[in-house]
Amino acid sequence: MVTWPHSVDDIGGFLITWLPIIFFGIIIWLLLRTMSLVPKVKPAMVDRDTTDPVGWGDVAGADEAKEELKEVVEFLRDRKKFERLGARVPKGVLLYGPPGTGKTLLAKAAANESGANFYSSSASAFVEMFAGLGAARIRKLFAEARKNAPAIIFIDELDAIGSARSGGAHNREHDQTLNQLLVEMDGFGGADEVVIMGASNRLQDLDPALLRPGRFDRQVNVAPPDLIGRDEILRVHTRSKPLGADVDIGVLARRTAGLTGADLANIANEAAIFAARNDQQYIRQVDFEGAMERVLTGLQKRRVVTEKEKRILAYHEAGHALVAYLMGDVMPVQKVTIVGRGDALGLAYYLPVEDRYLHTKEELLDVMKVALAGRAAEEIVFGRVTNGAASDLEKVTEIARAMVFEFGMSDIAPSRTMRADNYALSEETKRMRDSAQAQLTDHAYEEALRLISKHRVSLDRLAGGLLERETIDREEFLAIMGDLPRESRSAETVGTVRALDAEAL
């Protein structure tokens, strides 16, 4: 017979004594382990010896922003030049604009040109689950920058800690971090040679306290580059690449309207990859064109479509291209294809003649006609429409909405806006507003139907070419169009001064 040497009372006493100690020991161990996992490598000085130096020559397409930062650089180089005239140099510079426009590159160039120590960090590095850690890291960063002045502190994605305070208990850590940043910026004295730079894609979300004078004194808009800027950026990113004799940077710049510097750098890199894939010695124009199509519309996809669908697709894209040609220089056709890319089964590419910032009502109507021409071609040729025009309808709806709601291009309110969030509008006015929007889209579709019917022969010829070759470039397209007369010249009238008859006054 086996006997247990300890009584039940002894075991119970042991458990009562030691279980709470073991439990709390495990809790403390888990807490210490969790805190040890918190990243300790936080904002630190960038070592120029281990990074590629960036100067003003590497920054293109942002001349206005560059000039603003050059003044900051001049202050860090020769502060007495400003002090003897009583000038107060901005404490902070906020760079804002869409992603990929070169905000970080500008900050790096400014630091390198000034010779100042450069501290770079993302704002998300200051946000932690433990209260007070973000504020402590802000204090440490600014203390180190002051110790190593002259210095530039760059905080990317500033909206992560700089968004407007809500006052909620769950945002306490965020608010403490932001408050500490505000305190540190206020703490810069006249002897400080530290400039803080921030970058954000969402200026409207930042706390107003950050934007007041004395903190981020200068707010610099870093917008997507214009035609000249895109030309300069492409030259910067291709200067170390062997280019073929047929490469025309000017044409590439015209074809990339609306793209950012990051997009253009990606295009230059993709073109080099295309050339290397084909074991070429030089990068050709066709490599850049393929790179642009890949960046803009995605990978080429050879979907298996039926002959019936292929025919519908050919007439749809031919309708877009035909009406675009008839509209003159509003949307000059560069290429038409029924080879799918990304989510699109077919595409028509347009080459803007120049960068435009002002558009007339007639031009916007012409753009709507082009967008609806694919659907119009389907209806006229096949007697029915497909879901292939979904994105076209969305684009047309956005244009018509803007014309009525924002641009005052309707008969019901030609001298004021009628935004969707304007709750002061009566129900009758809202109904009239929606009716005016529908009238614009309906009129554009009726015009597209008329143009397609009138030029059916040219439509058939263009669709036949697409069915035969799948892709038609600009030269082939113009040859198919022949001497077809244009139906609209709205773009040619922009900026033309209308003479008034003195007798009519």
Each model region followed by its residue ranges:
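Glycine/charge-rich, flexible interdomain linkers and switch-proximal surface loops
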Residues: 85-98, 255, 309-310, 392, ...
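Conserved C-terminal "switch" segment of AAA+ ATPases
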Residues: 152, 189-195, 208-209, 222-289, ...
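Short acidic, glycine/proline-rich loop/turn micro-motifs
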Residues: 164-168, 300-302, 348-351
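Flexible hinge/switch segments at interdomain interfaces of large molecular machines
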Residues: 41-47, 112-117, 246, 285-298, ...
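N-terminal accessory segments that target, anchor, or regulate ATP-driven/P-loop NTPase machines
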Residues: 1-44, 204, 239, 249, ...
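Walker A/P-loop NTP-binding motif of AAA+ ATPase domains
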Residues: 9, 37, 43-253, 259, ...
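Short pre-active-site segment immediately N-terminal to the catalytic Zn-binding motif
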Residues: 303-312
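Soluble catalytic regions of large protease machineries
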Residues: 312-314, 321-505
